[in-house]
């Protein structure tokens, strides 16, 4: 009886740990009027606010994070680390080839474990949808272009 109780508790503990580990992989959600886009395990996914099966938007080598819908919901801006640098990218909200928007070459500041977070964090869009706001940590004369 004690052995069965121990095994039951052990299996329950392992299951709870696995669920908690998986939940920690889901990060940085952003919504528009009908969908939520989020990072999960380093890739971006989108799902209806009503629920359902999430659609994988990216599957690149490197991390994608901090997704933000455009005001019209047609595009997603996000931060990604593909070629060593952490840069801002843009792609259609339905998925597709990302377009790199920033070229800052800041390898020394792109440590994902840094307490300040990575460089070029996508923050928001302007209300008219013409510009993407992002946080950049360059302090040596970067002029915002």
Give the label of every model feature segment.
Residues 16-20:
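Sec/Tat signal peptide C-region and signal peptidase I cleavage site
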Residues 30-33, 67-75, 122-131:
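Blade-terminus and WD-like Trp-Asp/Gly-His loop motifs, strongest in beta-propeller folds
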Residues 28, 56-57, 100-101:
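Conserved beta-strand positions that form and line the central face of beta-propeller blades
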Residues 21-47:
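Beta-strand-rich domains and repeat architectures in extracellular enzymes and scaffolds
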Residues 39-75:
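N-terminal, post-signal-peptide region of Sec/Tat-exported proteins
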Residues 21, 40-45, 60-64, 79-89, ...:
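A flexible loop/linker signature enriched in serine peptidases of the S9 family
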Residues 4-14:
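Sec-dependent N-terminal signal peptides
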């Amino acid at each position: 009886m004690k052995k069965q109780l121990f095994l039951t508790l052990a299996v329950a503990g392992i299951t709870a740990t696995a669920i908690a580990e998986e939940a920690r992989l889901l990060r940085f959600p952003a919504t528009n009027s009908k969908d939520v886009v989020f990072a999960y395990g380093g890739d971006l996914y989108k799902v209806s606010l009503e629920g359902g099966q999430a659609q994988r938007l990216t599957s690149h080598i490197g991390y994608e994070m901090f997704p933000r819908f455009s005001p019209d919901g047609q595009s997603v801006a996000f931060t990604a680390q593909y070629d060593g640098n952490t840069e801002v990218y843009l792609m259609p909200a339905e998925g597709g080839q990302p377009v790199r928007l920033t070229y800052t070459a800041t390898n020394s500041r792109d440590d994902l474990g840094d307490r300040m977070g990575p460089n070029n964090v996508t923050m928001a869009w302007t209300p008219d949808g013409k510009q993407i706001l992002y946080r950049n940590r360059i302090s040596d004369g970067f002029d915002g272009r």
